[in-house]
């Protein structure tokens, strides 16, 4: 009987630790700093206009909405060098990212810039977005 009781207690303790670890991981994922890695594929012939829009307008609007620019990249090898822009944003949390994107999309300045920059056709064919957290060994946290 005592052996069964000890076994039951061990199972319950392991389940409790596992549950608590899962809560910690989930809470950290919801509230810890996150990075969003976004890759834009431009419409044919529109990459220069896309770079100009980011350079001249988008970064300032990001800043206004607490969207921290980490880095912007242009591929060096074809064919991606002809149509791709990749960048990384940082947010205090996933919830903050969601809120910032809603505010950004509803910003009258962004809506004006977007409309004007696409007067001769849309600039972006599609966007790929991935949210990530820095690993414990990453130099960038």
Residues of each region from the PLM?
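Hydrophobic membrane-insertion alpha-helices, especially the h-region
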Residues: 9-16
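Active-site-flanking beta-strand signature of metal-NTP-handling nucleotidyl enzymes
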Residues: 35-39, 86
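Soluble, non-membrane globular domain cores that form compact, hydrophobic packing
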Residues: 140-141
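Short beta-strand-to-coil "C-cap" segments at the C-terminal boundary of structured domains/repeats
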Residues: 10, 132-135
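Solvent-exposed loop/turn segments at secondary-structure junctions
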Residues: 45, 75-80, 93-96, 135-137
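Short, surface-exposed ligand-recognition loops at beta-strand->loop->(often short) alpha-helix junctions
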Residues: 42-51
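An amphipathic, aromatic/His-enriched active-site/gating alpha helix that lines ligand/cofactor pockets
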Residues: 4-5, 17-21, 25-31, 52-70, ...
